[in-house]
A protein has these predicted regions:
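Predominantly flavin-linked oxidoreductase catalytic cores and closely associated redox partners
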Residues: 135-265
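C-terminal helical "tail/cap" subdomain of flavin- and related membrane-associated enzymes
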Residues: 5-10, 327-417
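A conserved beta-strand/loop capping segment in the N-terminal third of enzymes
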Residues: 77-128
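FAD/FMN-dependent oxidoreductases across multiple families
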Residues: 9, 88, 249-341
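Glycine-rich FAD pyrophosphate-binding loop
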Residues: 45-64
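Conserved hydrophobic helix-helix packing surfaces used for dimerization/oligomerization
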Residues: 28-30, 51, 294
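N-terminal Rossmann-fold NAD(P) dinucleotide-binding loop
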Residues: 37-38
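Beta1/beta-strand and adjacent pyrophosphate-binding region of the FAD-binding site
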Residues: 20-34
Length: 417
């Protein structure tokens, strides 16, 4: 066992004055009240477990990742989430656009393989995340804001978490801390994806001319020399605009690039621009996403790239599937089983690997031009592409998905000297 893992398993009582026989504060401690954490908390609470959620931020708070996929619609239904006009904009698919060549092509979810929903939503993340948090609270979760985690671990008796103001114990720990990825940092198990996007610069507009997008209100994925950009219509005539590239970016890349293009100029004419933000080094996977009494979920387990809007979908679906395995184990006292989540990880790895294969081709080949701007793909291939774009990536009858997975296996296979 590595030094990092040995430190990780050091009992709490060895480093604090807390009574080692103190009662547990919860069955499950969840770090983070974002989409993955709130989903896990809601579904566990619904089944009668005591769930404590520790969130560092106050809600509502702004986030990107505003375009959802049909693959999460069953989870929203399971949670009892009802779309609201102030939070949701109907999304029927995606439109890929190259302004330099004046080419574009629309992909509608209704053309995917049978099984997935035919639409999704764009959401105001501040309100959407708050709605998910409120649902967890309504089902019985104890959600505490302003809780910055300073230390965490597991021992023979359970899991423990220290914040800047308190200490907590539980039977199980779920890390849904997003890009903070507390477990991965603790165990030094965050492995970057080096062939994906490196940085993103983005902003929002109020009173934008979103009606110029036409009747569909699909996300626009703008193919650009430096990478790609997004244009997402949000409720209340708001607009989310950003650029992603493999190299370093700054505000000039946004202002002199995507925002200077004809579509953005029309959409933002007369609109009020809000703060510009920059994020970088966000693509990674946690190579030890679970163990006895702990698991990572959502972005804390893996984040690929924003290009195909997979993050929130994988977070909600992953959290729901995690609960389906964890809840029976908690009832039976099996939560310390090191092999508890083996089958779950195989399932999630199929989803991650599918999107990773798509993202890698997008950045490193002429895939985007051939598939997304190349005209007629043929019915079978188009349905397969649409199913992946819809986040329906847990199926075994999609030949396009099989192609992506086979290509990744070949690239990762060891070569002879």
């Amino acid at each position: 066992m590595s030094t990092a893992c040995s430190f990780w398993y050091m009992p709490l009582e060895a480093r604090t004055n807390r009574d080692p026989h103190a009662s547990q504060d919860a069955d499950v401690i969840v770090i983070g009240a974002g989409p993955g954490g709130a989903t896990a908390a809601a579904l566990l609470s619904e089944q009668g477990f005591r769930v404590l959620v520790l969130e560092k931020d106050e809600f509502p708070r702004e986030k990107i990742g505003e375009s959802l996929l049909p693959g999460l619609m069953p989870v929203l239904d399971r949670l009892g989430i009802t779309p609201r006009d102030d939070t949701y904009v109907y999304k029927r698919g995606a439109r890929f656009v190259c302004e330099d060549s004046d080419r574009q092509q629309a992909f509608e979810f209704r053309h995917a393989l049978p099984g997935a929903a035919s639409h999704a939503w764009h959401v105001d993340r501040a309100l959407f995340d708050t709605q998910l948090r409120d649902r967890a609270v309504a089902l019985g979760a104890d959600v505490r804001h302003g809780q910055t985690v300073t230390d965490l671990g597991v021992d023979a008796r359970g899991a423990w978490v220290k914040t800047d103001s308190a200490q907590y114990r539980g039977r199980y720990l779920i890390d849904s801390s997003g890009q903070s990825r507390l477990l991965a940092r603790r165990n030094q198990t965050a492995e970057p994806y080096k062939r994906f996007g490196h940085s993103a610069v983005y902003t929002h507009y109020e009173e934008a001319n979103v009606e110029l997008l036409g009747p569909d209100f699909d996300i626009r994925i703008m193919l650009r020399p430096e990478g790609w950009g997004w244009i997402i219509p949000l409720p209340g005539r708001r607009l989310s605009v950003g650029v992603v590239a493999k190299g370093k970016l700054g505000r000039p890349n946004l202002d002199g690039g995507l925002l200077a293009g004809p579509l953005c100029e029309k959409l933002t004419d007369g609109a009020k621009r809000l703060e510009t933000n920059l994020v970088s080094n966000y693509s990674y996977k946690n190579t030890m996403p679970s163990g006895p009494r702990f698991a990572a979920a959502g972005d804390a387990a893996c984040f690929l790239d924003p290009v195909f809007s997979s993050g929130v979908t994988l977070a909600l679906r992953g959290a729901a599937d995690l609960v389906d395995v964890l809840a029976p184990a908690l009832r039976d006292g099996r939560e310390a089983d090191a092999a508890l989540l083996n089958a779950y990880h195989v399932s999630m790895q199929r989803a991650y690997a599918t999107f990773a294969g798509l993202v890698e081709r997008f950045y490193n080949t002429r895939f985007a031009e051939s598939y997304f701007l190349g005209g007629d793909l043929g019915d079978d291939l188009r349905r397969g592409v649409m199913s992946v774009l819809a986040g329906d990536v847990w199926r075994y009858d999609n030949t396009f998905q099989d192609m992506l997975l086979s290509a990744r296996r070949r690239r990762s296979a060891p070569t002879a000297n």
